Amino acid sequence: MKPKKNTGLVTVLTVLIIALLIANAAVLYLQFQISKGSSAPAQDATEAPTTEATVPTTEETEPPTTTMPDPEHVVSTATILSTGDLVMHIPVINTGLQNDGSYNFDSIFRYITDYVSEADYSIANLETTFAGTTNGYSYSGYPNFNCPDALADATKKAGFDMLLTANNHSYDTTLVGFKRTLEVVRGTEQETLGTYLSPDEQKWTIKEINGIKVGMLCYTYATGVDSKGAPQLNGNAPMSEAGLCNYFTYDNLTRFYDEVQGYVNDMKAAGAEATIIYMHWGIEYITYARDQEKAIAQKLCDMGIDVIIGGHPHVVQPVDLLESTVDPEHKTVILYSMGNAVSNQRLGNISSVSTPHTEDGVLFSITFSKYSDDTVYLEGVELVPTWVNLNANNGSRQYNIVPLVDSERSEWMTKFNMTENQFNDAQRSYDRTEAIVGDGMTKVQTYLEQEKQTREENYLLAVQSAAQGAQ
């Protein structure tokens, strides 16, 4: 008989074997996937995980910066030099006569040419005429002046840019000399101010100096005026034509003020950033300003004029600082009289002169500054006293305008070819002028320096405030 088969046990064993094979295959598959996904070795379970260090960027470590603009600052300056009366008496004219009959007046200016040429623009007051000698006139001094044309050549050579032609001697040689004077001066490429060839000429000028536009006016007093409006100068008959001279009369200042105010408005409308007026006024030989001139000056200040420079008294008069009664922020610098640049008005030479002050004059320099915001300010005023030295030390007479700088006093004798007596006279001249202008110059310079300091501090504060607001 055959033995009986155990089929149930076989079935169970078969199922277990298949299950083990499937589980083993699953483990192998999982290990393969893990090794495929990461090539890094397995991390030891006992080590702490590491973190890679990162370098912070500039933006993360520093606050953002704000570029601070520069404060407003000076971008250009214009220095204008003015000097006093060129009074050509016959003794002065005669010193210019050359052996060939021509004239040369270069020696008058020989010691001031550096000052004149170094300024950006230089101006002198021409107190004579150039009528020539072919129009019924000869060369003459007081009371009716007529000088050789060579004086205009000498002022040009010395570095002057403009001659003031409105004064009480403008009409000394009537209309022919009046007009020829303008033609001669303009023919040397120097400008004129105050008198005109035609009534249609503009009665003011604007000079653009280093980018700064300076408006200028020049007026003379007149002793009368006719029905046509033509002025009477120096007691002569009224001019034969009206509209050729800027003038005023003390008995009708309203007309003068109205006219000047109109011209000031016109100059500003035409772009003037600063204004100067030259006034031929006052009384001869007094070293102080009268109430009449002070009142006129105050009115001009109230019109907004920046600088007033006077002439005619033939002596130096004070410097002052005026405050506008209309706009307290506006100030005007004034030199009431520049004195004589050159003349023969010397103590002992002329009976009408009883003071040595007629030998004294000044080189008066004003400086306007333009800032980067296009505003213009009067920022500097300087004054060098001058003395007219009648020098005959080399055998020929010369009238020399001598600049008297106190710090160079020890050099005066050698530098200006002076005798000891002349040196002593020069020292007295310096002291006279300093006594007249010293206090006023200190007042003006102190004010201008304080204003500049305050202005630049305010500019800096404005920049700092803007920078803080931008943060």
Give the positions of each predicted feature.
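N-terminal targeting leaders characterized by basic, low-complexity, disordered sequences
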Residues: 1-7
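Acidic, metal/ion-coordinating pockets
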Residues: 2, 12-36, 52, 59-471
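Ser/Thr/Pro/Gly-rich low-complexity linker/stalk segments immediately outside membranes or between
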Residues: 32-48
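Long, compositionally biased stalk/linker segments
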Residues: 43, 47, 52-59
